[in-house]
Design a protein with these regions (language model features):
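Solvent-exposed loop and edge beta-strand segments that line ligand/cofactor-binding
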Residues: 7-8, 20-21, 68-86, 102, ...
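Well-ordered alpha-helical scaffold segments within catalytic/enzyme domains
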Residues: 37-39, 88-103, 152-167, 200-211, ...
Length: 629
């Protein structure tokens, strides 16, 4: 197939082909030009992506392909899904090409795409663990072999390369694999689903690129087959695989958090293409369940280590939080699709959730160098915490199960896609980011320029230049935690409407200004979140704060702090100053009521949660006990 200018214009991760409530803008059309997000994207391009490429070599992922074509004698290394690490890095490179136009990675892309193409067999099948270790077990143990999951990441990488660079070499590989799935599991074929969802959302995106409806039909079939007991549950139970109940009847999220959230992204994609209202209703119910009862303050998900799973409603322990980085990535994808779909929560709620996730859970998952990563993201780390394989005390340069680092790389490269969207008569600014946004054709040939130091500075200035169609509007989200703010322009001040956005005329030459309050605020949890009852967290703008042992003078310890009823004040840079007492030492594990009163009074520094752990292993906590009146 030929990749047209239209495809290039839609260089974005999710591009609905039907009339969605909101339409995405291509990554080249939304340029992050300053501030935190732009700097992060530059670090991602200069450090994270090259580091991932190095680790693909060091971890044996590329050798796994080479051994299939006779270019390596090494044994297969890594998990059954290790191929997906390569595909996610390819996708990261693709979105970086869309963002910056870089040619830095062209030679590497040529080599790895050629390698994958040569490893693919005549049937279209490609999966290095099965081909090289268990060639007689193709599609026989779908609970654990991740064949479709890995293929889903292959498809997403191929679509991204086609949209961003016009390359169809990997797309040919991906389509051959997708055609194999259609032949084997499509209409008239076997009923089967993958133990780890991902293929569903990928097939829909492949349909959007190619207009081949069999891909959409297979994705829809796989959504419909959930809950029919097709997967052997084993000791983790069918909830783990989201195979306990049909998707349309599953109103609460359960089981492996990443699997659930990828499945929901796929279900929402299917709705966006076929308009099945019953799917959207189920997704509305699940979205409310996840974000009102199962999301950490940082925008992380997953309370249990054993099966990387959601816990019960309000089961959100800070110190034992699993909070896998990939779960936040998966929810970003799902929540964006819910925004495009016009879900019941409304665009402001979706955009606010994504903002929380990006500035906190996702940002904390990578260090200041861009080369060390958290897999699990607890909101409290005790001083004697033991390192576990996927939950180390410090960020690691890579993991045996390395799903998270490439996921971070591909997500950061595509952040511009989530800043704004369009409707028939309006441009919607969802994120207050320093950016240049080209209007889509239906709104004119102009540019909306946003200048801001947010989230360090609450002032946002917006200028409209170029040609704009008559009657167009600009809709700017005003954060819920800044209810007194208004968008001020030539025709006066405009406050947020019921939808959370200020609506103003989109007119060439217009200038608007918004002052967002960045006053520190104290946040409490729902009373059923027993793990943090009697505690508060400190937030400023979209940032969650924490206290880290590295900022405390001896003999203070972070787990002894009690927050006093005193104003939280600004410190140096993005830090805050808290007034804390210390809980007195007690001789036993239990004691009589009332507890001894906290002692002394100390000024304590709080830092953004996203920055913790950059000074070595250190105790930390987000939720602080409060002193009794």
């Amino acid at each position: 197939m030929t990749i047209t200018e239209e495809h290039a214009r839609l260089a974005t991760p999710a591009a609905p082909s039907t009339a969605s409530a909101h339409r995405p803008l291509g990554i080249p059309a939304v340029r992050l030009t300053g501030g935190f997000l732009a700097a992060w994207q530059e670090r991602n391009a200069d450090a994270t992506i090259p580091h991932c490429i190095e680790q693909l070599e060091a971890s044996g992922v590329l050798d796994n392909f080479r051994r299939l074509v006779g270019e390596s004698q090494a044994e297969h290394r890594g998990f059954v899904f290790a191929d997906s690490d390569l595909y996610k890095v390819v996708e990261a490179v693709a979105w970086e090409i869309a963002r910056s136009g870089t040619r830095t990675f062209d030679g590497w892309l040529d080599d790895v795409v050629d390698l994958v193409a040569r490893a693919q067999d005549d049937s279209g099948y490609v999966h290095t663990w099965i081909q090289g270790v268990r060639p007689d077990q193709r599609f026989t143990e779908l609970e654990w072999t991740h064949e479709m999951y890995v293929g889903g990441h292959l498809i997403q990488a191929a679509v991204a390369l086609a949209r961003s660079a016009g390359r169809v070499d990997l797309l040919r590989v991906a389509r051959r694999f997708a055609d194999l799935l259609v032949d084997r599991f499509g209409p008239g074929g076997a009923d089967a689903i993958c133990g780890h969802p991902e293929i569903e959302t990928a097939l829909v995106e492949l349909y959007r690129l190619t207009a081949e409806r069999s891909y959409l039909h297979l994705a829809a079939k796989m959504i419909d087959l959930r809950g029919r007991g097709l997967l052997r549950a084993g000791n983790l139970g069918d909830h783990y695989f989201q195979d306990h109940r049909p998707v349309r009847e599953a109103t609460s999220a359960t089981g492996h958090a990443v699997r659930q959230l990828y499945l929901n992204a796929g279900a929402t994609d299917v709705y966006l293409e076929n308009g099945d209202a019953s799917l959207l209703a189920a997704m509305d119910a699940q979205w409310a369940d996840v974000h009102e009862r199962k999301m950490y303050l940082s925008g992380a998900f997953g309370s249990r280590h054993r099966d990387e799973a959601f816990g019960d409603d309000y089961e959100l322990p800070s110190d034992r939080a699993y909070a896998e980085t990939c779960a936040t990535v998966a929810d970003l994808q799902w929540t964006w699709r819910m925004l495009l779909a016009g879900g019941a929560a409304g665009p402001a709620r979706y955009a606010e959730t994504m903002e929380r996730e990006v500035y906190n859970a996702l940002a904390a998952a990578v260090d200041a160098s861009g080369t060390r990563f958290f897999y699990a993201n607890p909101l409290q780390l005790r001083p004697d915490r033991r390192t576990e394989e996927n939950a180390p005390r410090e960020r690691a340069s890579w993991y045996g199960c390395a799903c998270c680092p490439p996921n971070i790389a591909r997500t950061v490269a595509q952040l511009g896609a989530y800043v704004a969207s369009a409707t028939d008569d309006a441009l919607w600014l969802h994120q207050l980011a320093d950016a240049e946004i080209d209007l889509p054709d239906e709104l004119g040939a102009g540019t909306v320029r946003v200048r801001t130091g947010y989230p360090s500075d609450g002032r946002v200035e917006i200028e409209v230049t170029g040609e704009v169609v008559a009657g167009a509007h600009l809709c700017v989200r005003i954060p819920r935690w800044s209810p007194g703010s208004a968008l001020v322009g030539p025709d006066g001040a405009h406050r947020a409407g019921d939808d959370g956005y200020a609506h103003v005329p989109l007119v060439a030459g217009s200038r608007y200004a918004l002052e967002v309050s960045l006053a520190p605020r104290l946040t409490r949890a729902h009373h059923r979140v027993d793990a943090v009852r009697g505690c508060v967290a400190v937030e400023r703008g979209p940032l969650v704060y924490c206290v880290e042992q590295a900022d405390l003078p001896a003999p203070l310890e972070v787990d002894d702090l009690v927050l006093l009823a005193a104003p939280v004040t600004a410190g140096d840079g993005d830090t805050l100053r808290l007034r804390c007492a210390t809980a007195p030492a007690e001789p036993g594990l239990y004691g009589p009521e009332p507890a001894p009163r906290p002692q002394s009074d100390h000024e304590v520094t709080a830092i953004p949660f996203s920055r913790w752990g950059n000074r070595g292993a250190s105790a930390m906590r987000v939720w602080l006990p409060t002193a009794a009146p």
